[in-house]
A protein has these predicted regions:
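Glycine-rich tight-turn/loop motif centered on a GG-T
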Residues: 18-28, 62-69, 102-106
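Short beta-strand segments
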Residues: 4, 38, 46-49, 79, ...
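Short gly/pro/ser/thr-enriched loop/turn and capping motifs at secondary-structure boundaries
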Residues: 8-12, 34, 52-53, 99-100, ...
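Well-ordered secondary-structure scaffolds
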Residues: 68-75, 82-320
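Phosphate/diphosphate-binding glycine-rich loops and adjacent basic-rich segments that engage nucleotide
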Residues: 39-86
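Active-site cofactor/substrate anionic-group-binding motifs, chiefly glycine-
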Residues: 1-9
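Acidic/polar active-site rim loop that often engages polyanionic ligands
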Residues: 12-21, 55-63, 95-96
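A glycine-rich helix N-cap at a beta->alpha junction
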Residues: 18-44, 114-120, 124
Length: 320
């Protein structure tokens, strides 16, 4: 897996920011180092190189001033140009849809997914897109250090069942694209036998990360428990609202030049569809500045509770 990732902006998180919450982790690698690491251990995640698809930055700046940032053909060409230029033989695309995603409705998500898959196939790449739900946060954590800790739980087979199943399904699709036929059950076994965790640790070490720091809990000064004021079932946890809330804690950037606080964020104890009682913990908020009661009230307003349980389907559709 050779992956080039980006940074977060606004309510969206960035893979690079999360990895940089690990002490010493280097996201800048030369092309030679990147290729060698993938050959040696089979895995590397780095930042996007200025030497790759130089025209894309110019085109994005042009889109920004011509009201075409959300034009599907231009989004597709921007995303796929990087994947193709990086040399990937097989490409799995996660196209999110919903309140917290760039694509707000399923028709637009399908159109984007189909366009990118067709572009990949046109240049001889095995390409599949998965349309996934982003109406609520994926997993339980929002925030850089907190998301690394959740990922480590999953890699040790200790993650939430719904997220673990989702990741194993994506893993099966990725392996299929590489002509390795495995069942979801076989993929899951790698989480429980420790081999997936060992591979992640090998990447951290190869890119200068400190393994002791990797497992360190968040050092946020304040941890506030947000509790439910009514009983029922969680019906909404709007991903965008909570992403913006975490940004205000320092976990995200309002503008590209903002500094991040890696330790802050949110950990949900309950997700959509789950039952909750009065006084039960909905989430824990991690902050380095004291959290006001007004902020807690604002958080609670975004947690919707109803009388009926609601099922969330993480993978909505696969387009190949």
């Amino acid at each position: 897996v050779a992956k080039m990732s980006g940074r977060g902006l606004g309510h969206t998180g960035g893979t690079l920011d999360k990895l940089e919450s690990i002490k010493g982790f280097q996201i800048e690698r030369s092309q030679e180092e990147f290729i060698k690491q993938v050959q040696d251990i089979g895995l590397s995640v780095i930042g996007q190189s200025d030497q790759l698809v130089k025209a894309d930055k110019l085109l994005y700046a042009l889109r920004d001033v011509t009201a075409t940032v959300d034009t599907i053909p231009l989004i597709a060409s921007s995303v796929m140009s990087k994947k193709i230029a990086a040399g990937a033989d097989s490409i799995l695309l996660d196209v999110t849809v919903g309140e917290g995603a760039f694509m707000k409705n399923l028709d637009d998500a399908r159109a984007l997914a189909r366009t990118m898959v067709d572009l990949g196939k046109a240049v001889g790449r095995r390409t599949t897109a998965v349309i996934t739900d982003m109406s609520q946060p994926l997993g339980t954590s929002i925030g850089n250090r907190l998301e690394i800790l959740e990922a480590l739980d999953i890699l040790q087979g200790k993650g939430r069942e719904d997220v673990t199943e989702f990741i194993c399904e994506l893993g099966q699709i990725m392996l299929g694209l590489a002509n390795v036929e495995k069942t979801v059950k076989e993929v899951r076994e790698h989480l429980f036998d420790g081999s997936a965790l060992q591979k992640f640790e090998a990447m951290v070490v190869a890119q200068g990360g400190d393994l002791e720091d990797l497992y360190r809990p968040s050092s946020a000064k304040y941890v506030v428990e947000v509790t439910a004021d009514e009983a029922g079932y969680i019906s909404e946890l709007p991903a965008m609202e909570f992403g913006l809330f975490a940004m205000r804690l320092g976990a995200g950037r309002a503008v590209k030049t903002d500094a991040l606080d890696f330790e802050t964020g949110i950990v949900f104890e309950k997700k959509v569809g789950e039952s909750i009682e009065i006084g039960e913990i909905v989430a824990k908020v991690y902050a380095n500045e004291k959290i006001s009661q007004e902020l807690v009230t604002e958080f609670k307003k975004n947690v919707k509770i109803s009388n009926e349980s609601k099922k969330v389907q993480e993978i909505i559709e696969v387009i190949a």
